[in-house]
Amino acid sequence: MATTPIFNASCSFPSTRGIDCKSYIGLRSNVSKVSVASSRIATSQRRNLVVRASESGNGHAKKLGMSDAECEAAVAAGNVPEAPPVPPKPAAPVGTPIIKPLNLSRRPRRNRASPVTRAAFQETDISPANFVYPLFIHEGEEDTPIGAMPGCYRLGWRHGLVQEVAKARAVGVNSIVLFPKVPEALKNSTGDEAYNDNGLVPRTIRLLKDKYPDLIIYTDVALDPYSSDGHDGIVREDGVIMNDETVHQLCKQAVSQARAGADVVSPSDMMDGRVGAIRSALDAEGFQNVSIMSYTAKYASSFYGPFREALDSNPRFGDKKTYQMNPANYREALIEAREDEAEGADILLVKPGLPYLDIIRLLRDKSPLPIAAYQVSGEYSMIKAGGVLKMIDEEKVMMESLMCLRRAGADIILTYFALQAATCLCGEKR
């Protein structure tokens, strides 16, 4: 059966499709030629008028030279063109029991029988527009591979990053989020480098906006990349993470990012009250149109390991359980969501993604705001490792995992697979 691809290598705005659409989207009919038999049959023999599929000819049915009225009269008189025979019923394997069919009023498999109907009735779709591409940046000139994340790099902010963004845009991914690896010499206990207007992130934003004005840039608002303690907030001498003082620093960081040209600031710190404080700070500086994507339900997960290696941002002591959410909790996500909504969040994010599909669905059902899901580094690395070891089909599992996040209710997905998945959706492999 011949197929016509709906995507090509140069697509810059590909359509949506399902995870298995390669096999059926855009199919051509396998009936390439149609002809009508010239013989007449007896008037007493009445049969339905059909046309025969032919494998030869020029693809056009042979005309009989009759008017519509003459054709209708011929059929009414029983002079019907020859039709193909009724196809035989496919044979069952030898030994199949002969039974009375089940008396079922509904057989859901009927709607799954054909690739065409499966495509028509598909409830969830996915496209490159749904992806936000997380990119790691550093001060160096070279792109450094991240050992725990095959295929991911710390990109040189002036060269490698620009090239990677160009690749993503070519396949329809026009949203990115930046994560900096900050030199140790610039880190301190209060994370002051986070709001340096000439720091790595603001410089990078200005560079990208100069080259790609329509690129949507999300930024991370948190102190851990800038903190000598590796925590998301200021640490008191007794180990307590100071909430309000941290929020003060985060407000300055968000304003600095907005000043550089960020479109969406994304507080990932999980401090109480930070969304409202950041909203007020942005508005006071004239950045009313800068959006806030709040990490609403960020769990104290074990899936973050590769990310922390990438940024060298592991906490120097303890863990993050006093501010990130308990993985055992469900209802608590509603408390966070309601607070973030009331404080002015524009997007609510759940992190990690696949292990927390129930939380994504909960927020989707309870909130009118757009929902984001973060397919985190651990999720990415597990799929990559399984693919390298030939234990799974990497591409199929990748696409299925992303479709599951969409099905659960995510409007956008932060995923390290963004470029690879979008390339797949465009019908080419990287």
Curated annotation (Swiss-Prot):
GO terms for molecular function: metal ion binding; porphobilinogen synthase activity. The active site is at K298 (schiff-base intermediate with substrate), K351 (schiff-base intermediate with substrate). Mg(2+) binds at E336. Keywords: Allosteric enzyme, Chlorophyll biosynthesis, Chloroplast, Heme biosynthesis, Lyase, Magnesium, Metal-binding, Plastid, Porphyrin biosynthesis, Transit peptide. Gene3D superfamilies: Aldolase class I. SMART domains: ALAD. 5-aminolevulinate 1 binds at R308, K320. Highly expressed in cotyledons during dark-to-light transition. Its EC number is 4.2.1.24. Induction: Up-regulated by the transcription factors FAR1 and FHY3. Its cofactor is Mg(2+). One of its GO terms (biological process) is protoporphyrinogen IX biosynthetic process. It holds the Pfam family ALAD. Residues 82-101 are annotated as: Disordered. It is found in: Plastid, Chloroplast. Disruption phenotype: Embryo lethal when homozygous. Impaired plant growth and development. Catalyzes an early step in the biosynthesis of tetrapyrroles. Binds two molecules of 5-aminolevulinate per subunit, each at a distinct site, and catalyzes their condensation to form porphobilinogen. Belongs to the ALAD family. NCBIfam families: PRK09283.1 (NF006762). Homooctamer. This is Delta-aminolevulinic acid dehydratase 1, chloroplastic. It comes from Arabidopsis thaliana.
